[in-house]
């Protein structure tokens, strides 16, 4: 099971999200993902995501996380599995307008689904998942878990930030 972490400094906060801050949280979960680790910090230091990888669906480096869409406006750290990702990808390919980095990553399907349908994309997903998704266009952090909580998602609000 992968591990995801992140932080968001609230507007007006003096706190800055740094790579050591995210990496420190991420590396406490090294046992959750022996296949790799990644970190992303926004340019303004307001938000950061981290990921410990346990490769299941797409073993390629192109599927490493945190992952962004093609223009860098969406960033995701994801744990779980979208069982129907191939069907959703086929639908997105038929619609067109998306550039794919991977052959079959369910993480990338989530990103392009969010681009296409917004938060309503969740209605299409069948699976178990915990997701942290940063939408830079509207400056919103979405924390999402599957409907019955198979993949837990814990967060804390303190000191003008959420972690």
Outline where the language-model segments fall.
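Cysteine-centered catalytic environments shared across enzyme families
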Residues: 1-163
């Amino acid at each position: 099971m992968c591990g995801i972490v992140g932080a968001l400094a609230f507007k007006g906060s003096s706190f800055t999200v740094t790579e050591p801050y995210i990496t420190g949280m991420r590396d406490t979960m090294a046992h959750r993902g022996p296949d790799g680790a990644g970190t992303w910090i926004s340019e303004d230091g307001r938000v950061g995501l981290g990921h410990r990888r346990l490769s299941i669906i797409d073993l390629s480096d192109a599927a490493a996380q945190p992952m962004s869409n093609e223009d860098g406006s969406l960033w995701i750290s994801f744990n779980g599995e979208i069982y129907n990702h191939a069907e959703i990808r086929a639908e997105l390919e038929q619609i067109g307008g998306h550039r794919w980095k991977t052959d079959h990553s369910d993480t990338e399907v989530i990103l392009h689904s969010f681009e296409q349908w917004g938060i309503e994309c969740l209605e299409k997903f069948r699976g178990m998942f915990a997701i942290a998704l940063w939408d830079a266009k509207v400056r919103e952090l979405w924390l999402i878990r599957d409907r019955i909580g198979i993949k837990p998602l814990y967060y804390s609000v303190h000191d003008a930030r959420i972690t």
